[in-house]
A protein has these predicted regions:
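Conserved subregion of the PPM/PP2C metallophosphatase catalytic domain
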Residues: 1-267, 273
Length: 274
């Protein structure tokens, strides 16, 4: 799918020798992909969905192409994952929410990598507060601030107003905040801990919750290159002898999140300590 339309691609028929089947062959195509191209392929459980109904006596057929075109034209940055899910869900709907055949769909989307910056914890040296703020301001991509002190530093250095958003709640976590120029502002170590648990459990799409941790996980999984900027200052205002332990907990949780994102979700992740 390219520039708002489906592109015809030449195919070559190649015979394949198999002992269990006669007259077996493959169709081979070669082509050069361009930025924003999408390759979409699916099983006949999709193309034949709805077969025998009054609306689709012969199945979905070309209606699937029309459905895909409408979706992509309306949401031109729709992810490969979301597009594949929507196609399969519509096929299930065509079959009266009871699929008649195995139904699979795969989408490949050629696009620029999506970058995400996650900042958690204040810099070790207060002189680096300005450096942290500049990193946030100049970063080309989505931005998450994880921790009240971190958010306060960015708000102060960039002159950005911050306000609590009570529309998104989680009984386990403090609410998120809103800040101009930042996509998500959350509490720190508790939120990171829940993010790690969700990534470990997997299957985020089946979770009904929509709290701070779930929002953060979805942003992580919708990104390709993720930078975790971890501050190493101990907040002396708390006067808590356990704070060095808390700092180590934050480091360990961030390392676990990095490991999960790289090994389980195939993300490109970098940790930077400041």
């Amino acid at each position: 799918y390219r520039n708002g339309r489906f592109v015809s691609i030449s195919k070559e028929k190649i015979p394949v020798e198999r002992e269990d089947l006669e007259n077996t062959f493959l169709w081979i195509s070669e082509f050069t992909l361009e930025k924003e191209d999408r390759i979409i392929f699916f099983s006949d459980g999709v193309s034949q969905s709805g077969m025998g109904t009054a609306k689709m006596p012969f199945g979905w057929e070309d209606g699937a192409k029309e459905y895909i075109a409408n979706l992509v034209n309306q949401y031109n940055d729709i992810s490969a994952k979301e597009l594949a899910h929507k196609i399969v869900n519509q096929a299930e709907k065509n079959d009266g929410y009871s699929l008649k055949d195995d139904t699979s769909c795969c989408v490949i989307y050629m696009r620029k990598p999506r970058n995400l910056l996650v900042c958690t914890g204040p810099p070790y040296d207060e002189k680096n507060d300005k450096y942290l703020a500049n990193r946030v301001r100049e970063f080309q991509g989505k931005k998450i601030l994880c921790g009240g002190t971190t958010a306060t530093i960015i708000s102060r250095e960039l002159g950005a107003k911050m306000e609590v958003d009570m529309n998104i709640v989680d009984k386990e976590l403090p609410p998120i905040s809103k800040m101009e120029g930042v996509d998500l502002v959350t509490e720190g170590i508790l939120t990171l801990g829940k993010v790690e648990r969700i990534l470990t459990e997997g299957d985020i799409d089946r979770r009904r919750e929509a709290g701070p941790a779930e929002l953060m996980v979805r942003m992580l999984l919708n990104s390709d290159k993720i930078t975790l900027l971890v501050g190493t200052r101990i907040n002396t205002a708390h006067q808590d002898p356990n704070l060095p332990v808390e700092l180590e907990i934050r480091r360990n949780v961030v390392k676990k999140i990095k490991f999960l994102l790289e090994t389980k979700y195939l993300k490109d992740v970098e940790i930077m300590y400041i």
